[in-house]
Structure formats: C-alpha cells, structure tokens
C-alpha cells in the first residue's frame, strides 16, 4: 500500500524497521529520540491520508508520548499504528528499557485497539490485521527466542477474539 509510511525513534536497526527503509526510502522517517514529536508527525501524516506505522521501544513510545497518543491519535481516532517493541521485562537493556506499564497506559485510551501476537508467524498476521483497522492500534511486539506455537493462533488471528494456548 503506497499510503503506508514508517516512522522510527532512532532505532531502525534495533527494531528492524531498517528493512522498510531499504525497500521504501522515500516513505521512511526517523524522528530521533523525540517520541512525542514523532506522534505529532504521524498524526499530521494520517490527517493527510497516509497510514503511519510508528516504531520504537515500548517503554519510550508509551511513556514519553502518552499525552500525544491520547490527544492526537486516540480521541480523534486517527489511522496510526503504534508498534511497541520489547514490552515487559524481556529486554536485556535494564530497567530503563522495561515497559511494565505500557498496557495500562494504552488500555485506558478510547478508540485504541491493542494487539499482542504470541509468535513470529502471528506477528505477521497481527500487522496485517492492524493495517485493516481504520483507527489507532497499539501492536505490542516481542523479540524472544521462545516460540509459543499453536497452529490455530498462527493461522486465524481475529482481533477481539482470544485463543487458548496450551503449554506442553
């Protein structure tokens, strides 16, 4: 989709958004370490007809830009996709990079859909599902060597419907 643009907070290699930059350099924007400004840029792009995918570490995306996400994306229901990378305690970068409150911050916002895939295969389905939603979405993305696998989960992701995972 030529309307899709990518924005990153100076973390292209770490979040693998450099792959988009290489494929579509004119649709890739690096805001530097200025997450709040990046949300404002994404809001303006969405109002102009683009579909921004904003990518940063979960902790920085949700904490540093919470007010902008609420006022510029969630309340006006703008079509912006937020991809928060390394949520929870999974990061090796220490407490400053641990997003333990990102779900609480995003869950209270109106009009915002939250999607958290459980595996690499489901991540691809989650991104496709997010792209189909006309409105703001928070994708909570993990990078973990542990794979939670369930064929039904990987094949049939339906936003708003949970699936059971069985630990074997």
Which residue ranges define each predicted feature?
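Conserved small/polar residues in nucleotide/adenosyl-binding loops
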Residues: 166-168
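Thiamine diphosphate
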Residues: 1-140, 145-150, 154-161
């Amino acid at each position: 989709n030529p309307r899709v643009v990518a924005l990153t907070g100076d973390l292209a290699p770490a979040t693998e958004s450099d792959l988009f930059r290489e494929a579509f350099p004119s649709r890739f924007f690096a805001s530097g370490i200025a997450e709040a400004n990046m949300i404002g840029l994404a809001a303006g792009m969405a109002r102009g007809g683009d579909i921004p995918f904003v990518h940063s570490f979960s902790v920085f995306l949700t904490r540093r830009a919470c007010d902008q996400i609420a006022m510029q994306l969630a309340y006006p229901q703008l079509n912006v996709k937020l991809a928060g990378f390394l949520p929870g305690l999974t990061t090796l970068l220490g407490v400053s990079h641990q997003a333990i409150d990102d779900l609480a911050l995003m869950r209270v916002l109106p009009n915002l859909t939250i999607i958290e895939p459980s595996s690499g295969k489901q991540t691809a389905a989650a991104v496709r599902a997010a792209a189909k939603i006309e409105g703001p979405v928070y994708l909570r993305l993990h990078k973990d060597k542990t794979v939670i696998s369930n064929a039904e989960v990987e094949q049939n992701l339906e936003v708003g419907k949970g699936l059971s995972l069985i630990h074997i």
